[in-house]
Curated annotation (Swiss-Prot):
Disulfide pattern: C5-C35, C13-C32, C21-C53
Glycosylation (residues): N42
Name used for this protein in its record: Ovomucoid
Keyword tags: Disulfide bond, Glycoprotein, Protease inhibitor, Repeat, Secreted, Serine protease inhibitor
The keyword Isomerase is assigned to this record: no
GO molecular function: serine-type endopeptidase inhibitor activity
Domain-related comment: Avian ovomucoid consists of three homologous, tandem Kazal family inhibitory domains.
GO CC annotation, single: extracellular region
Organism: Turnix sylvaticus
Matching InterPro entries: Bifunctional_prot_inhibitor (IPR051597), Kazal_dom (IPR002350), Kazal_dom_sf (IPR036058)
Pfam name, any one: Kazal_1
Length: 53
């Protein structure tokens, strides 16, 4: 399971409300918020699964 974050980071996120569960067991509201967190973590954050944790 993966998400393409190549176009991130983005300065602002629209609220898509498509939850993603990260490897930190945190639920991200959408791909934008998740991908921005991946960039901030220098790629250490990964996707556990789609949906809430």
């Amino acid at each position: 399971v993966s998400v393409d974050c190549s176009e991130y980071p983005k300065p602002g996120c629209m609220m898509e409300r498509l939850p993603l569960c990260g490897s930190d067991n945190k639920t991200y509201n959408d791909k934008c918020n998740f991908c921005n967190a991946v960039v901030e973590s220098n790629g250490t954050l990964t996707l556990n699964h789609f949906g809430e944790c």
